[in-house]
């Protein structure tokens, strides 16, 4: 198991965010982009997981590989993604996906309350099953 890097990036409303802000919670780092059809198709499943577990010591941080801020913000609103979102709007030149070995999207990383990676690339039913198993 690897401990995650702590980084700071701007939220879509321009507030800085750091992973250390979420210590003590399970955190799903959700790598996606507005221009990615498979990501947008997976979003309802992610929304469902968030609604089901947000009051059980769980949250999501959306990490976008967008380069157009307006399209990114519109996708967040259109897909009802009500958790924290970050992007440096650098597309694949962003350093954060590389930190987690992300080479394609959608992708995600599940961190335990200590910031340790406990699962990667869990989508669909696997996401629900993993959360059900680890979040008691």
Where are these regions (language model features)?
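Short, small-residue-biased leader/transition segments that mark boundaries at the very start
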Residues: 2-15
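A short beta-strand-turn-helix
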Residues: 14-27
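Conserved redox-active cysteine motifs that mediate thiol-disulfide chemistry
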Residues: 23, 31-48
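Active-site acidic short loop of glycosyltransferases
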Residues: 23-25, 55, 81, 102
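Short beta-strand segments
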Residues: 30, 60-64, 86
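Structural microenvironment flanking redox-active thiols in thiol-disulfide oxidoreductases
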Residues: 41-79, 91-98
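Thiol/disulfide oxidoreductase modules built on the thioredoxin-like
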Residues: 81, 88-134
């Amino acid at each position: 198991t690897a401990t995650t890097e702590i980084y700071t990036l701007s939220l879509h409303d321009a507030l800085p965010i750091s992973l250390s802000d979420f210590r003590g919670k399970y955190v799903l780092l959700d790598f996606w982009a507005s221009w990615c059809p498979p990501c947008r198709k997976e979003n309802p499943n992610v929304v469902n997981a968030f609604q089901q577990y947000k009051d059980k010591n769980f949250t999501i941080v959306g990490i976008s590989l967008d380069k157009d801020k307006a399209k990114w913000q519109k996708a967040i609103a259109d897909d009802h993604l009500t958790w924290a979102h970050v992007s440096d709007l650098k597309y694949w030149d962003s350093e954060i996906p590389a930190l987690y070995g992300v080479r394609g999207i959608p992708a995600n990383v599940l961190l335990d309350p200590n910031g340790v990676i406990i699962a990667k690339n869990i989508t669909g039913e696997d996401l629900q099953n993993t959360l059900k198993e680890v979040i008691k």
